[in-house]
Amino acid sequence: MKGSNRNKDHSTEGEGDGKRPKRKCLQWHPLLAKKLLDFSEEEEEDEEEEDIDKVQLLEADGLEQDVAETEDDESPEQRARRPMNAFLLFCKRHRSLVRQEHPRLDNRGATKILADWWAVLDPKEKQKYTDMAKEYKDAFMKANPGYRWCPTTNKPVKSPTPTVNPRKKLWAFPPDSSRDLPTPKKAKTEVPQLNFGMADPTQMGGLSMLLLAGEHALGTPEASSGTCRPDISESPELRQKSPLFQFAEISSRTSHPDAPSKQCQASALFQFAEISSSTSQLGGTEPVKRCGNSALFQLAEMCLASEGVKMEDTKLIKSKESDGGRIEEIEKGKEERGTEVEKTTETSFQKEAEFGKSAKGNVRESKDLRDIEQLQMDNVMAIKVEDPKEIRKEPEDDQKYSHFPDFSYSASSKIIISGVPSRKDHMCHPHGIMIIEDPTTLNKPEKIKKKKKKNKLDRHGNDKSTPKKTCKKRQSSESDIESVMYTIEAVAKGDWGVDKLGETPRKKVRPSSSGKGGILDAKPPKKKVKSKEKKVSKEKCSDITKESRPPDFLSISASKSVPGEVPEGIKAEPLTPTEDALPPSLPGQAKPEDSDCHRKTETCGSRKSERSCKGALYKTLVSEGMLTSLRANVDRGKRSSGKGNSSDHEGCWSEESWTFNQSGTSGSKKFKKKLREDSFLGSAKLDEEFEKKFNSLPQYSPITFDRKCVSTPRKKKKTGNMSSESTKTSKGSGDKWSHKQFFLDAIHPTEAIFSEDKSTTEPAFKVKNALSIPNTPEPTTMQEPLVGSQKRKARKTKITHLVRTADGRVSPAGGTLDDKPKEQLQRSLPKVPGTYCGDNCSHSTVEEPRSSTPDMPAVSAFFSLAALAEVAAMENVHRGQRSTPLTHDGQPKEMPQAPVLISCADQ
């Protein structure tokens, strides 16, 4: 509840400062950043509330600012909070009381209660506050002669620009940043094609990257697919850049099918993004084939592509000199393979069916796979060796073919070829392997064998993680939205997560495996592949690692590029310096991951409610420094929110703080504010004087308002449970009394339900009194102050601010909660009387409709049946738990929940 308070403060704070908004996420969100200014106002409903909120907001602006910031050039006048009016003074004076009674109540709810009280005050009583306000305003204007009454926007003069501009700058940045990358050949030619540039991740909030990824995945899949084909040379650079940046690029490009070969270096994540986007784009030609082929095949292909890409990346990086030639050759191979792959996929599936049954053959096949890998490695080597001229030609071919979705896979397959060295690829991607082999070097039969083996492996892997199949299917169902989801998940699981949080990938493994077979292998490939392989291939790994070394150059480089693949090459081989840091953590993580992955994959065919990557991305961002942990803010808010109790408020009234504390901000915040304000507000003296006077203002006890409520038909909300309860009864005051005391009884049951604090006898006694002596308010008993987390937890017993007012509206304190109580009242009224009063039942039931109907005419309109049902269920539980004697006549009748403190105001 205090959250709303906090939000307002932060938002305005962000406005005011532009420097340290409390909730940075708002700043990062491109849309929210602009709307920040509007939020606080949207929430204000009443004028009084608006005034209070404005004051609070204004206070918040300055309070949280660092002293240094507060002392900048701007005159204090611009920062000065507008002087409080009489009502605000009243609120400031009494908010602590409300807080005492309703520790869980948010600031707005408290203000509503205060507004009720204020309305009840006699003009004489109000006069003191009015005078004080006038005095203060005069003094304030003297102290701040240049002060101008701002429009209701609450924003200090400089506020909007700082928050918004940084964002604009960031966005303006992007086009250049991509060009800055030293992408020797294609990058420059192709970069201009990019639809948009990514902001430099170092200067950009992590969340914005996600947003961008989503936007671009949704908005520019086709255009970007064609546009972006970063060069191979570019990819190494990309790799050097943070994975986050790569991710951003990936999302921006929404990867182009051909891009994979070049981008493979960028990162598995990048590849994955490409794959997912390409799948969505492929929608036309290949998707059909792929869907037909089977989720498995697609999955394998994607995995292979991603892993192959990774491996290629490493290899390409290692042999940068020959990189262009190799890749291009690979690309040529890709196109050829693309056709082959389509053919082979069907054959592979048939064979898959044959081999799927025997997982036993996997071990043997693993050996075969090794051989195949070696062959493939040889092929790859050959490809690398090929002339750069060919390479140049091939890129052109690739570009030509890039238009065809088929080639996105073929491209990935090319990549995979070099990547094949790692068993993971084989395991994960039966098809990919086939693709990997050069059509020229490997005969189709060989490919088929490999495919069979891979299929078996896949099956094996799928046995472990059946979700894979489903995942693939999901991809085949490809939609832009899904691709976006994949991208984001990829990010969460991605290289980036891998680099930063070894753990993140684990968490993410399940989701990735769940929907994104490609992701499974592609980004987490480092980890996920590893995990799969570890399980599947650890048996084989011992052999494989040994044998894979012959192709060591490739396998090792691949393993280096894919830390997650450590099991194969990495275990035995040193990592490249850049990746050294990552792999060490990965192996350990990968192992736990193995079990996690499989477990998750089994459970998570499609991502149900279970989230394996809870906060992984967030953690990654935080660990990277892209995000500031929100925990500090939350904790601060909680700490302060709990402190809204009287002690804090009253203690805090001292000095200038009163001006800022009005909002009922928690004590800790108040103290900070005091210190800061002391330092920077020239009007400190004014505040001090005002503080003294302010403290001299009368502080009326809630009981006072209760009495007034009784005498005045106007609804008065009590702060105490008792007072609030009494106000509840008082809502109906005079007019309802005519309805009979039954009305009280009908209401009381529900009220009892809401106020559970008091002993059962008390309510009964009070009810009797109320009936007999309708006009005597019950003394309000203050709740004991809550400590620690209790302050933050809503207790059913504490929902005392949900009181129906004389007009039958729930008093505003609770907001929507109030409305529910009304419904609860309506529902419970009939039930309670029927259930608990034998003879009086008929009366109460008759009366209830009256009371509830008049009191809550529109309640039903506000709530859905489901909500009502929920309320009813809760009430039933309460009834079962507590029964208090209340009678229509004042005789004890069983009422649910003793704590009904009804000061018989409802007459």
From Swiss-Prot:
Gene label: Bbx
Keyword vocabulary terms for this entry: DNA-binding, Isopeptide bond, Nucleus, Phosphoprotein, Transcription, Transcription regulation, Ubl conjugation
Residue ranges, compositional bias (Low complexity): 723-732
Reported effect, residue 281 to H: In strain: C3H/He
GO molecular function, a single term: sequence-specific double-stranded DNA binding
Entry protein name: HMG box transcription factor BBX
Taxonomic path: Eukaryota, Metazoa, Chordata, Craniata, Vertebrata
Cross-link (Glycyl lysine isopeptide (Lys-Gly) (interchain with G-Cter in SUMO2)) at residue(s): 384, 571, 693
Basic and acidic residues composition-biased segments: 1-19, 496-506, 534-550, 591-612
Disordered as annotated region, ranges: 1-24, 37-80, 152-185, 220-242, 435-483, 495-612, 628-672, 708-736, 769-854, 877-907
Biased composition (Polar residues): 152-164, 656-668, 772-783
Annotation: DNA-binding region: 80-148
Modified residue annotations for Phosphoserine: 242, 476, 483, 701, 789, 811
Comp. bias regions, Acidic residues: 39-52, 61-75
Annotated Gene Ontology cellular component terms: nucleus
Source species, domain of life: Eukaryota
Coiled-coil regions, chain positions: none
GO biological process: bone development
Transmembrane segments: none
InterPro entries found in the cross-reference section: BBX_HMG-box, CC-Dev_Transcription_Reg, HMG_box_dom, HMG_box_dom_sf, TF_HMG_box_BBX_DUF2028
Keyword Transcription regulation assigned: yes
Role according to the record: Transcription factor that is necessary for cell cycle progression from G1 to S phase.
Location in or out of the cell: Nucleus
Compositional bias ranges of the Basic residues kind: 447-457, 790-801
